Regions:
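Long, intrinsically disordered, low-complexity segments
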Residues: 77-79, 110, 118-171
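A generic helix-loop boundary/linker signal
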Residues: 72-73, 105, 117-119
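Sequence-pattern detector for short linear motifs
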Residues: 22-25, 41, 92, 135, ...
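Elongated scaffold/linker segments in the mid-to-C-terminal portions of large proteins
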Residues: 1-81, 160-171
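Extended, hydrophobic/aromatic-rich amphipathic alpha-helical segments that build helical scaffolds
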Residues: 9-14, 76-109, 125-135, 139
Length: 171
């Protein structure tokens, strides 16, 4: 979803997305070194992938729930965001073939993210889904959105990182 806009969107910055992982066991010979990505299906490191830092929480002692690594699962969570409202309305405008207003709504969200504005001619259903992924990562029940839009199967086939998932999902 960042292709063509890799450096031009603060939602993708190193401050917002963790892409580097380091060994943290101080007794290990690997301490402080980067964890190299694995490519095989049998290695558990296949499950280490970039994620948004907003779910990291504070890395502290595991016994202290107010500061421990818990993915912030103990904190309040967002139900609706203004950005989601703009993106829903952009989708409605798109379905009415009003690409100018769809682009305006998307650009409200992109402006806040300091991302390059989208042109009306570039607004497609895929673009709206990609923008939802960029903006609402970990906040949106993505599966429900894809089902609602009738796009679950084709998006899984196109983007799943696991071949078995891509090839076994059924219409």
């Amino acid at each position: 979803v960042w292709k063509g806009n890799w450096e031009n969107d603060m939602r993708n910055s190193v401050h917002n997305m963790r892409r580097e992982f380091r060994y943290t066991n101080s007794k290990s010979a690997y301490f402080g070194q980067l964890v190299e990505p694995r490519k095989t299906e049998i290695d558990t490191m296949q499950n280490v992938y970039p994620y948004p830092r907003k779910i990291e929480g504070d890395i502290g002692t595991l016994t202290n729930t107010s500061t421990s690594w818990s993915g912030r699962t103990y904190q309040d969570f967002i139900v609706y965001r203004l950005a989601e409202t703009y993106l829903l309305r952009a989708e409605a405008y798109f379905r009415l073939n009003d690409l100018e207003n769809a682009a305006k709504d998307i650009n409200v969200v992109r402006e806040r993210a300091r991302a390059k504005p989208v042109q009306a001619s570039d607004v497609t259903e895929d673009y709206i889904l990609d923008e939802r992924a960029r903006e609402l990562i970990t906040e949106e029940p993505r599966r429900r959105t894809l089902v609602r839009m009738g796009r679950l199967v084709d998006r899984v086939r196109k983007y799943s990182i696991r071949e078995l998932t891509r090839t076994s999902i059924q219409d």
